[in-house]
């Protein structure tokens, strides 16, 4: 009887211990942190991306790029630090994203695809782009999908463009194309530009950011409807981080953050055209080296990026020290007599003096702007004032404020500047008529030149990206450049 009771007690103890163990295991499983909680606990948001002008790169001032800026804002929303990781190619990006302990998300100009891949999910879209077939100027232009048959075509391996071509091949079995994981969009455009391949397929935003580096490339036709870019997150049923991402992107769209980033990175592209891009490429080789040291010296003295000063000089005179306009402004920085005297310039035709004087003048204008105007808008406002004068710029700011816009944001004020040339508007201003539309173009051009100079001079540029052009833009005869006098009438 006692033995039976002891046996029952042992069984009860075993069952109790087992129950406690299972209960603890269940509690442990229930308390496993979500993806969002892990990010917040670690204090770091790990984001994987691609190294390209349209996504992420480093310049003199550090990390930058559309995707970087957007991811940085998201990290700030979460109250954590942003850590950027770069992938060698798209397959590598998705592989790292799906591995255990990998990055929290991918922000790399991705279009949702890979429907059969359960290891990845996509957020709400935030930027509409159009896939485009790219060909080389001077070659026969394809106008329809069947024209791709028989052409040398290369696209990024693992991209949505490769999926599009795979679908097209079902309709045209003779279609041939190559997928490569050893190149980036920049490389594909270069290969079309120099004739190594006949065609490629890229998104419209990538082309917009890169076309000026490759002035021979052209759009053949849009390959399908516009699609939205999205962030990618690891697959699974944990929606905590995904919900936060979607809420952030929706708010960024509603509150204008996405529009401001689009303006910053894409709002000033496509302003040069083929002739302007090709000419600038030549002048980078033939003219800038003569004056680069002067720009760098002024930039160092004034604590300003020398490439922005050089961009102003190019917009003003095409880097021609003897340039003269009908209004009497002269020299590489096109200074008036009054400005030259105020800046201590005794000879406007001396390139060193002109660069020093013009640079000093620009920095002075920027320093005198209201403190409420922050960078990068502050530099764009300074460019506008450099061109049109501070008084007219103030008229445009007041006009923006009356319209319910932000007088401290370039995106808003640039909408008002063209009104200064319309009587119904300038009649109500303090300083009257001004060619405000020209000022908008001036700022757009300087920003574009500045972007190009920033990209081609950045120290981290990799061998497969631009380096083959020897830090000069491709599409230019590098062996026998045509010399120019450097002095032309404007």
From Swiss-Prot:
Disulfide bonds: none annotated. The active site is at 316. GO terms for biological process: cell wall macromolecule catabolic process; cell wall organization; peptidoglycan catabolic process. The keyword Lyase applies. GO terms for cellular component: cell outer membrane. It catalyses: Exolytic cleavage of the (1->4)-beta-glycosidic linkage between N-acetylmuramic acid (MurNAc) and N-acetylglucosamine (GlcNAc) residues in peptidoglycan, from either the reducing or the non-reducing ends of the peptidoglycan chains, with concomitant formation of a 1,6-anhydrobond in the MurNAc residue. It comes from the Bacteria. Keywords: Cell outer membrane, Cell wall biogenesis/degradation, Lyase, Membrane, Signal. Gene3D superfamilies: 1.10.530.10, Periplasmic binding protein-like II. Residues 1-32 form the signal peptide. In the N-terminal section; belongs to the bacterial solute-binding protein 3 family. The N-terminal domain does not have lytic activity and probably modulates enzymatic activity. The C-terminal domain is the catalytic active domain. This is Membrane-bound lytic murein transglycosylase F. The gene is mltF.
């Amino acid at each position: 009887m006692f033995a039976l009771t002891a046996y029952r007690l042992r069984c009860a103890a075993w069952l109790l211990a087992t129950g406690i163990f299972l209960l603890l295991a269940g509690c442990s499983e229930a308390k496993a942190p979500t993806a969002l909680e892990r990010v917040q606990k670690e204090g770091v948001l790990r984001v994987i991306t691609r190294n390209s002008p349209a996504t992420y790169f480093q310049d003199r001032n550090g990390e930058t790029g559309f995707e970087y800026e957007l991811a940085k804002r998201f990290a700030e929303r979460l109250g954590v630090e942003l850590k950027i990781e770069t992938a060698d190619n798209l397959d590598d990006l998705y592989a790292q994203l799906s591995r255990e302990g990998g990055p929290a998300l991918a922000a790399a100009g991705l279009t949702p695809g890979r429907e059969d891949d359960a290891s990845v999910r996509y957020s709400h879209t935030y930027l509409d782009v159009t896939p485009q077939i790219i060909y080389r100027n001077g070659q026969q232009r394809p106008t329809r999908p069947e024209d791709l048959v028989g052409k040398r075509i290369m696209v990024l391996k693992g991209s949505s463009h490769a999926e599009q071509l795979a679908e097209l091949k079902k309709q045209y079995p003779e279609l041939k194309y190559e997928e490569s994981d050893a190149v980036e969009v920049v490389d594909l455009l270069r290969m079309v530009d120099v004739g190594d391949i006949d065609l490629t397929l890229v998104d419209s935003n990538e082309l917009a950011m890169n076309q000026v580096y490759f002035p021979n490339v052209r759009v053949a036709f849009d390959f399908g409807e516009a699609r939205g870019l999205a962030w990618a997150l690891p697959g699974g049923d944990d929606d905590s981080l995904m919900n936060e991402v979607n809420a952030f992107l929706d708010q960024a769209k509603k509150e204008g953050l996405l529009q401001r980033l689009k303006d910053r990175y894409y709002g000033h592209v496509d302003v040069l055209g083929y002739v302007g891009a090709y000419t600038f490429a030549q002048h980078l080789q033939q003219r800038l080296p003569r004056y680069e040291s002067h720009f760098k010296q002024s930039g160092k003295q004034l604590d300003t990026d020398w490439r922005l000063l050089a961009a102003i000089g190019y917009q003003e005179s095409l880097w021609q020290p003897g340039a003269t306009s009908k209004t009497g402004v002269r020299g590489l920085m096109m200074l008036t007599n009054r400005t030259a005297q105020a800046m201590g310039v005794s000879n406007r035709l001396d390139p060193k003096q002109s660069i020093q004087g013009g640079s000093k003048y620009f920095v002075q204008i920027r320093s005198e702007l209201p403190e409420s105007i922050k960078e990068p808008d502050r530099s764009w406002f300074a460019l506008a004032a450099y061109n049109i004068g501070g008084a007219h710029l103030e008229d445009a700011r007041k006009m923006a404020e009356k319209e319910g816009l932000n007088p401290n944001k370039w995106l808003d004020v640039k909408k008002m500047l063209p009104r200064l040339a319309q009587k119904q508007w300038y009649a109500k201003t303090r300083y009257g008529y001004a060619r405000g539309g020209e000022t908008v173009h001036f700022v757009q051009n300087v920003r574009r030149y500045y972007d190009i100079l920033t990209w081609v001079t950045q120290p981290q540029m990799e061998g497969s990206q631009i380096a083959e052009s020897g830090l000069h833009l491709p599409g230019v005869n590098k062996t026998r450049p045509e010399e120019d006098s450097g002095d032309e009438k404007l």
